[in-house]
């Protein structure tokens, strides 16, 4: 269910801003998006797993807060990140 270390490292390398970046908002959003996608697939197979559904809603909320932070700080980076991750955003 959780991300494998190798998958996590690939995501970090793809979305990092510099060589030692592991925790920037962009990296956190990318990691959360990957976990959200995995959990969504799990919930399609197991619709009565309400604890996982709650966890999914919490992850979506955390990702939304991070995206709002990025949008306020740098709208250009926000649009680029949303496009790369295929995240729908309000216009």
Curated annotation (Swiss-Prot):
One of its GO terms (biological process) is translation. Keywords: Ribonucleoprotein, Ribosomal protein, RNA-binding, rRNA-binding. CDD domains: Ribosomal_S15p_S13e (cd00353). GO terms for cellular component: cytosolic small ribosomal subunit. InterPro entries: Ribosomal_uS15, Ribosomal_uS15_bac-type, uS15_NS1_RNA-bd_sf. Pfam families: Ribosomal_S15. GO terms for molecular function: rRNA binding; structural constituent of ribosome. HAMAP family: Ribosomal_uS15_B (MF_01343_B). One of the primary rRNA binding proteins, it binds directly to 16S rRNA where it helps nucleate assembly of the platform of the 30S subunit by binding and bridging several RNA helices of the 16S rRNA. Forms an intersubunit bridge (bridge B4) with the 23S rRNA of the 50S subunit in the ribosome. Belongs to the universal ribosomal protein uS15 family. PANTHER family: RIBOSOMAL PROTEIN S15, BACTERIAL AND ORGANELLAR, SMALL RIBOSOMAL SUBUNIT PROTEIN US15M. Part of the 30S ribosomal subunit. Forms a bridge to the 50S subunit in the 70S ribosome, contacting the 23S rRNA. This is Small ribosomal subunit protein uS15.
């Amino acid at each position: 269910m959780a991300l494998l270390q190798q998958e996590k490292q690939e995501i970090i390398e793809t979305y990092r801003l510099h060589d030692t970046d592991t925790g920037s908002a962009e990296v956190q959003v990318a990691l959360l998006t990957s976990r959200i996608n995995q959990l969504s697939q799990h919930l399609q197979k197991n619709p009565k797993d309400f604890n996982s559904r709650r966890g999914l809603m919490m992850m979506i909320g955390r990702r939304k807060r991070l995206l709002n932070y990025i949008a306020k700080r740098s709208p250009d980076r926000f649009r680029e990140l949303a496009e790369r991750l295929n995240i729908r955003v309000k216009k």
